[in-house]
């Protein structure tokens, strides 16, 4: 079982990235491959979950341990496999997902790929309260997280005003989720990624 991999990001495709370490290239399936586009040929650390099947050993990768924890919680629900869990992470900001589960918002959950009403109900039943328990978040840490997200949102709005497309910024935003930077730092780092 692998916890993480550290190596050079050598390739990006629509479904996976390749990280090279010790002369081997590892295919790693991630939610938003192009969110790594600013790090091609640079060293990266990717958190991992391995799925062993009869016909393949698959690696699923994540920007942060929190994103990995959300993935593990999702695949614990009957009817949600690794591919569906990645698709959910790819189209959501994670906060919306957690809020929908804790508030029993079936309508919100059924917007995700391959999630019908029955699976949404199962998600609520199995996962309500789990994300806070898993991360050990207190009211204070949630407040800090909210402030960090506010800085990121403000930076994304500034980049929109500069003429960048929402589709471009979604990939950039996904990369910076869970980080703690000032608005100016987010803008500077985002521009560096967007201009490559």
From Swiss-Prot:
Residues 148-196 are annotated as: Domain III. One of its GO terms (biological process) is DNA recombination. It is found in: Cytoplasm. Residues 64-142 are annotated as: Domain II. It comes from the Bacteria. Residues 1-63 are annotated as: Domain I. Its main location: cytoplasm. The keyword RNA-binding does not apply. Keywords: Cytoplasm, DNA damage, DNA recombination, DNA repair, DNA-binding. One of its GO terms (molecular function) is four-way junction DNA binding. One of its GO terms (cellular component) is Holliday junction helicase complex. Residues 143-148 are annotated as: Flexible linker. Belongs to the RuvA family. Has three domains with a flexible linker between the domains II and III and assumes an 'L' shape. Domain III is highly mobile and contacts RuvB. Homotetramer. Forms an RuvA(8)-RuvB(12)-Holliday junction (HJ) complex. HJ DNA is sandwiched between 2 RuvA tetramers; dsDNA enters through RuvA and exits via RuvB. An RuvB hexamer assembles on each DNA strand where it exits the tetramer. Each RuvB hexamer is contacted by two RuvA subunits (via domain III) on 2 adjacent RuvB subunits; this complex drives branch migration. In the full resolvosome a probable DNA-RuvA(4)-RuvB(12)-RuvC(2) complex forms which resolves the HJ. The RuvA-RuvB-RuvC complex processes Holliday junction (HJ) DNA during genetic recombination and DNA repair, while the RuvA-RuvB complex plays an important role in the rescue of blocked DNA replication forks via replication fork reversal (RFR). RuvA specifically binds to HJ cruciform DNA, conferring on it an open structure. The RuvB hexamer acts as an ATP-dependent pump, pulling dsDNA into and through the RuvAB complex. HJ branch migration allows RuvC to scan DNA until it finds its consensus sequence, where it cleaves and resolves the cruciform DNA. This is Holliday junction branch migration complex subunit RuvA. It comes from Streptococcus agalactiae serotype Ia (strain ATCC 27591 / A909 / CDC SS700). The gene is ruvA.
